[in-house]
Amino acid sequence: MTTGARPKEEYVAEPQLLPAWVNPDLDRLMGVHKERDGSYFRSWAESKVDLPAGAVFARINGITPTSQQDYATVQSGPNTHFVWNSDLYYCNHSCAPSLECDTSTWEMRVSRDRPLKKGDVLSVFYPSTEWTMDREFECWCGAGEGKCCGIIKGARDMNDRCLQRFWLNDHIHALRKQRANIPHL
């Protein structure tokens, strides 16, 4: 008589690193570091995995949508923002970013320019999502002369020569096109 039951060994699976879109376990993909030096506090994220250029690093999920912009939100459309509810919050700005935050596909992807290596700092180019920013800041990314944009602002207020070097979200392209079509007074 056949019972249809599978042998026990078919239920045993070896642990493996699952892609983020299958099992969004960021602890397997990234580590967060925090340091305090007197009154100065800094934090950053590092990769725990090697991935090729353009690969999906993680899906963007578990976020809180908001219409209010502040220093901790990410712009996801012309009038929409969200708050991270994950360690992806610790991906800082760089003018040589290791990741791209794509709000049209809800993916964090490895930069198209280079692969991601274990130990790399996880970073994004903030103006790739932000049209305006709550707070502009002096960049300390260390990308080097001719690569670092200097003062980081929203894409609206950044130099076009600087922005042309970076991957930008669809809503940033649309807002730039809209601004270009408005006659200047």
Model-flagged regions — what are they?
Residues 2-101:
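Catalytic cores of histone-lysine modification enzymes
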Residues 95, 99-185:
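C-terminal SET catalytic tail plus cysteine-rich post-SET Zn-binding segment of SAM-dependent SET-domain
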